[in-house]
Curated annotation (Swiss-Prot):
Keyword Transmembrane: no
Organism phylogeny: Bacteria, Pseudomonadati, Spirochaetota, Spirochaetia, Spirochaetales
One Pfam family of this chain: GATase_5
Organism in which the protein naturally occurs: Treponema denticola (strain ATCC 35405 / DSM 14222 / CIP 103919 / JCM 8153 / KCTC 15104)
Xref: PANTHER family: PHOSPHORIBOSYLFORMYLGLYCINAMIDINE SYNTHASE
Function per UniProt: Part of the phosphoribosylformylglycinamidine synthase complex involved in the purines biosynthetic pathway. Catalyzes the ATP-dependent conversion of formylglycinamide ribonucleotide (FGAR) and glutamine to yield formylglycinamidine ribonucleotide (FGAM) and glutamate. The FGAM synthase complex is composed of three subunits. PurQ produces an ammonia molecule by converting glutamine to glutamate. PurL transfers the ammonia molecule to FGAR to form FGAM in an ATP-dependent manner.
Gene: purQ
The protein's name: Phosphoribosylformylglycinamidine synthase subunit PurQ
Subunit record text: Part of the FGAM synthase complex composed of 1 PurL, 1 PurQ and 2 PurS subunits.
Gene Ontology, cellular component aspect: cytoplasm
Amino acid sequence: MKPRALVLHATGTNRDGDAARALELAGAEPEIVHINKLKAKEKNWKDYEILVIPGGFSYADALGAGKLFALDLSNYFFDEVSEFVAAGKPVIGICNGFQVLVKSGILPGKEKDGKVILDKDGYKNRQATLTYNKQGRFECRFTTMIPQKSNCIWTKDLKGNIHCPIAHGEGRFLTDSQKTLDDLFEKGQIALVYGGKDAEKSIPANGEYPFNPNGSLADIAGICNTKGNVLGLMPHPENNVVIRERDSEEEKERTKLCLDMWKAGVNYVL
């Protein structure tokens, strides 16, 4: 039986179909569900084994990218989301979805009695943020990510770099302190970093533009929680999962790695 995946939709999200297609190719049974159906109890969180928060511009990015969507999760679904994460179910937030995970407090993640502490006020428990790109403009192009040694169930077994598009204006990852950044490294929560001009040698961007497209601290492209089941990243792996006959062998391998990341999340619950 295929694992059921909840692709969460809110006004303004626009990568729902792309994420659903990637999940199908990876062996899951995705369902795109508007958040209002969950509020109305027409759908039940417990019916799903995987959660995807896709990219887009939820609620037109009012009050900041992902902010209102994050407040939806932390205020309407505090218990449901906490239980979903605590159960070890795979969760992935992409671009706007990453912003939602960070601004709700799900990432980097504070826990109490085995449950994640969501940020109902939108700032009190926040250890990190995703803010305006350092270059001050929207970035839309392909980029390279280097998987790191981490706890992340989505990325830890990938062999090779991930090549996929970015499309964001607020992707600069920052922490509230050097200690928080150090803790992320020490606890194995840095899942992906942007690769530099020598990315094939696993050398990060070292802050250099355009390889680090937004000025993120330590070239961070994606982080996970301490348990490793929740991943947030700015680039879009759902947009490079279809292998075409005309592609070169190198391009096919790059596409395979994006799909392998989705398969890792799906296979985790099989």
